[in-house]
Amino acid sequence: SVIVGETFVSDTDFAAGQRATGAIAGVDENLLRERRQLDAVTRESLWAALAGLATGKRISAVGNAVETVVTENALINGWEAGIIEEFVGHGIGTKMHMPPDVLNYNVRGIQARLKPGMVLAVEPMLTRGDIASQTDDDEWTVRTVDGRDAAHWEHSIAITEDGVSVLTARDGGVA
């Protein structure tokens, strides 16, 4: 789903509007371009993070990949996305949210070593403005404090002997 200002738009309505018009009625073309760029950078950072995990040795491969994509796209787009630090990916096991944390940014120190059998949710969250966020009273909806756009892409993966299997992609992440 998408929240535009105070308007909630379902995934179906958003997709239908995009297919029918190629644009969202009432949205400035520059703003629409920036939103598409933010979405593309976030999606690209997800796939770069997954590729990093496939060849990396530690969970820090995610933060390295996300930061690299953000920096490279800043040069292309003329603006740099902010990496939301308050929400991160996580391990999945007997509960949905478990250690280890899967950070979308670099930190000093050694992070967990990747081991076959680990299942992780990798979920970069980027913003067009400040990275500060707030959670609504429903305890689910999160917004940026400055009201700027944010984007979130996510996949769950299993670390295998041969790399990764993208559990939430129909093709396992092969494409």
Locate each region found by the language model.
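Active-site neighborhoods and metal-handling regions in enzymes and metal-associated proteins
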Residues: 1-18, 22-175
